[in-house]
C-alpha cells in the first residue's frame, strides 16, 4: 500500500517536472517570448537542473539538448524507481534490462509530449472563449500554432468555427494508440 502511494507521488512529481522541462524546450524551439510570467515560471522551476547540464551538453542545430536529455534522465529515473518500488527483480533481469528501461522512458517521454500538446490545445480553446487577453495566451498560442497551422490548410472553417483543434486531438489520440 505504501509502495503504491510512493509510486503515485514519484510519477506525479517526476512527470510534472518533465512537463516543465518539455515546456521549456518547446518554448525555445518555437521562439516564445520569455518576458511572459508563465515562461519565467517555467524557467525558474527548471533552471536549477538545466543550467549545470548545459555546461556538459552543448546546444546543437539551435536545439537545447540539455533540456531533452534532462527530461529523458528524469523519466528514466521515474521508470526505474517505479519498477523498484513494485519489486521488479533487477538482479535476475541482468544487464539487458537497462536498454529496455531506457526505451520505456523514451516512449513515456514521447507520450508525455503528446499529452502536453493536447493540454496546451485545450487551454488555448478554452482561453479563446473565456479570456483571450490573459498573459498566458501568447505563450499557449506560440506553442500550439505550429501544430494547428498545417491542419488549417486541410480542414476548412465550418460556419466561422475553427475545427483544427478537434482534428489535432484526434491525431494525437491516434499517435497515443500506436504501440
Q: What are the language-model segments listed below?
A:
Residues 1-179:
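Selective transmembrane helix interface/packing segments
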